[in-house]
Amino acid sequence: MALLAAATLNPTTHLSIRSRAGHNSENLWLRSAASSQKSKGRFCNLTVRAGTPSKPAEPIGPVFTKLKPWQIPKRDWFDKDFLFGASTSAYQIEGAWNEDGKGPSTWDHFCHTYPERISDRTNGDVAANSYHLYEEDVKALKDMGMKVYRFSISWSRILPNGTGKPNQKGIDYYNNLINSLIHHGIVPYVTIWHWDTPQALEDKYGGFLNRQIVNDYKHFAKVCFESFGDRVKNWFTFNEPHTYCCFSYGEGIHAPGRCSPGMDCAVPEGDSLREPYTAGHHILLAHAEAVELFKAHYNEHGDSKIGMAFDVMGYEPYQDSFLDDQARERSIDYNLGWFLEPVVRGDYPFSMRSLIGDRLPMFTKEEQEKLASSCDIMGLNYYTSRFSKHVDISSDFTPKLNTDDAYASSETKGSDGNDIGPITGTYWIYMYPKGLTDLLLIMKEKYGNPPIFITENGIADVDSDPTMTDPLDDWKRLDYLQRHISAVKDAIDQGADVRGHFTWGLIDNFEWSLGYSSRFGLVYIDKKDGNKRKLKKSAKWFAKFNSVPKALLKTTNTNNKPAVTASVSL
C-alpha cells in the first residue's frame, strides 16, 4: 500500500501522521535526504510538510513502515534444517599480523605501504584480536543461538611464503577454533580464500595476474583439506571474486591496488580494462583445480560439499523500456554471471563474450569440463540493489574501467528521481529486500535451482549517522535483517532452494578501505576496553529468535532437490 501523508513536526521530532485516505498512523523510519520513494515492497512514499498545509512540501526521503508484529520473522517460518549463522574473514578480525610465523599478506603490505588509502589510516595489525580472543567469538555465537560460523583461512598464516611446508602454529590456531565451534554445537563453514593473498606470491610473480597462482592455490587448498577436512564438511573456494577483481585491479582501491596509468590508485601501473579479467580467469581455474582435488581425494564418504561465494547486487530497470530491461540483464551477467556461469556451464555469459572481445580470456575444452557443475553449494553475498540504465553502444563511448563493459550504468535513483530504497547510514547500501528475493528466483529459474546459502547480508553502523546514539542500539541493522530474512522466506515459498542465512558480520571488524569507520558486527568491539565483545540489540534479537526448540520446527526433505546442473536457461 502506498501511503501519502502529511505530517507536522513537533519539538520532540515525533511525527503525527494522518493519511489522506484515513489510514491509521504508522511508525516510520525517516532519513535526512531530499528525495522520496515510491511504493516497492513494504516501502511507502511519504511527503512531510513542516508547518501549515499551505507551505510547499519538503520531501525528506525514502521511508518504510515499521514491521507489524506478525511481519517480524519467526524461527518457525523455516524448517529445522535451515541454518542461521554469521560470517567473518581472517584479515578483518584476526590481528596478530606477524605472530607465530605468519607471513605478510597483500593487505598487510597495502595498509603499511599506503596508509593514506585507508579512510581512517588504520590497518588489520590487531583488528578485533580474534587470533587471541577466538573463544569470545565462539561464546558470542553460542549466546545468539547461531548454528553456523563462516570464517576464512589466512593463506599466509599457514603458508607464510605462499607455498612449501605449512606453519604448524597457524594450523593449530584454526584447529583450536574449529574444535571449539564443534564443542559448542556450531558448524564451521570455511572460506579458503577471502582476498588476503600472500605478499610473497605478489612479489614473486604478480599474484593472481600470473597463471602460476593456480597451482599454488591448489597446494594451499590441499593443506586446508588435509588439516581440517575431517571436521569441516562445507567449503567455499573463493569469496566475492567479482568485487576483488574490480576493486583490486580495476579501480585499485583494494590490495594490491592496481589501476591504469593516470588513474588515482596506489599502483597506477596496471590495465583496468584487462587485469580484472586476467585475475578472474585465474581464480576460476584455481577453483576448478581445487574442486577436482577435493572430489578425488577428500570426500570419500560423500558427506562434504564445496562451492563458491558470489557477491551479488539486485537490479531494476531504470525505466520501463526495452533498452533498460536489456541493460538489467547485462548488469546481472557482469555482476553475477561473470563467475557463476563458468562454474555452472563452463564459460562466461554470451553478453560478456560479445562485448569484451579478446580482453576476456578463453577456456580450453578441458578447463570447461572441469568448471562445469563444479559447485555443490553456492553462497550469495547480498547487501543492496541499483537501477540499471542503458548506455549506447557506439564508437563515441570508450570504457575506462572493466565495469563500463556492460554498457549499463548503475544508478541509486530511478527515472522518477526516487532512490531505490532508504539509505542505511552506509553510503553504498540502500535497503531493498525485494532485490534478494528476485536474485534467488533467478537462481531457481535460470541456473537450475542450486542449494544456496546467503553467506553475507547486513549493514554497517557509522559515526556520521545522527540516529546512532548508542553503539549497542543498532535498530537499523535489526530492521534491515528482519526484512531480508523475510525476503529469503518469500523466495523459499516460491520454490528457491535456500539452506541458510549468515549475517555479515559476527563482530565489528576492519572494513577494508573504510578501516574501522564502518561497523558491520552483530557484536560491538570496544577498542577502549581490550576489544571486549558486547552484544548489540540485533544480536539479542537473534538469541530470542533462535531459542525455539528444534523439536517444534518442521522438517523438509531436501534429499531430492535438484543439484547444480551444467545447463543455463536463456
Swiss-Prot record:
pH behavior = Optimum pH is 5.5.
From the record, give the cysteines joined by S-S bonds.
Answer: 259-265
Keywords assigned by UniProt?
A: Chloroplast, Disulfide bond, Glycosidase, Hydrolase, Plastid, Transit peptide
Cross-referenced Gene3D superfamilies, in alphabetical order?
Glycosidases
List the catalytic activities from the record: Hydrolysis of terminal, non-reducing beta-D-glucosyl residues with release of beta-D-glucose; DIMBOA beta-D-glucoside + H2O = DIMBOA + D-glucose; DIBOA beta-D-glucoside + H2O = DIBOA + D-glucose
**Tissue and organ distribution:** Expressed in young seedlings early after germination.
Q: What's the superkingdom here? A: Eukaryota
The record makes one more remark, namely:
Wheat is a hexaploid with three different genomes that contains at least four genes coding for GLU1: GLU1A (AC Q1XIR9), GLU1B (AC Q1XH05), GLU1C (AC Q1XH04) and GLU1D (AC D5MTF8). The monomers can aggregate in diverse combinations, reflecting the several isozymes found in the native enzyme described in PubMed:10750901.
Q: What is this protein called?
A: 4-hydroxy-7-methoxy-3-oxo-3,4-dihydro-2H-1,4-benzoxazin-2-yl glucoside beta-D-glucosidase 1c, chloroplastic
- Kindly list the organism's lineage: Eukaryota, Viridiplantae, Streptophyta, Embryophyta, Tracheophyta
